[in-house]
Amino acid sequence: LGNSLGGHIALLYAKFHPEMVKGLIITGSSGLYENAMGDGYPKRGDYDYIRAKSEEVFYDPKVATKEIVDEVFDSVNDRNKLLRTLAIAKSAIRHNMAKDLPNMLTRTAIIWGAQDGVTPPNVAVEFNSLLPNSDLYWIDKCGHAPMMEHPDRFNEIMFSWMEQYKL
C-alpha cells in the first residue's frame, strides 16, 4: 500500500520482487508524471505558506489540521528528512515506469481522489490502462490523500477489493 511517492516505491518493489507481493494498492502514486513535490517548498520556514501548501493537497482544506500542518512544517524544516524526501522524489523522476507496468502482473487496486490536484485523475486512468491486472476506484470530493480525507470509504474499497481477490 503506497500513497504518492510511497506508491512509486511500492510499484518498484513489486517490479523487482513480484514473488513477495500478492497484491498492491496505490493512491495518488507517482511513477508516470512527476509532480508529487509540486513546486517544492521554497518558503519552508514560513508556517502560513506551509499551511496553504498542505491545504492544497485536500479537496476540503479543513482536513489539513494544525497537527498535519505542524508535521509537514517539521518535516520540511528538518534538513535530513527534507534531503531524503528530495532524493526519493528525484529518483522517481528518473524511474518513469510506463514501459515496466504492462509486464507487471501483480493484482493492483488503484484508489484515487477524483479531484487530486497533485497527481490528477488522468494519471490514474493511465495506470489502469498500463497495469494488466488493475482495478480503478474513484473517491469523489477527494484530493491527493483519500485515506486521510475519506478513510471510511477508502477502507471499504480496500477491504472489499482484498476480499474479492482473496488477498
What positions do the PLM features span?
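A short beta-to-alpha transition loop/helix N-cap that caps and shapes the active-site region
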Residues: 30-37, 61
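Conserved alpha/beta-hydrolase catalytic His-Asp/Glu region
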Residues: 44-106
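Short beta-strand/loop motif that positions the catalytic acidic residue
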Residues: 104, 110-112, 116
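Short alpha-helix in the alpha/beta-hydrolase fold that links the catalytic acid
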Residues: 106, 120-129
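Catalytic active-site module of serine/aspartate enzymes centered on a nucleophile-bearing elbow/loop
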Residues: 134-167
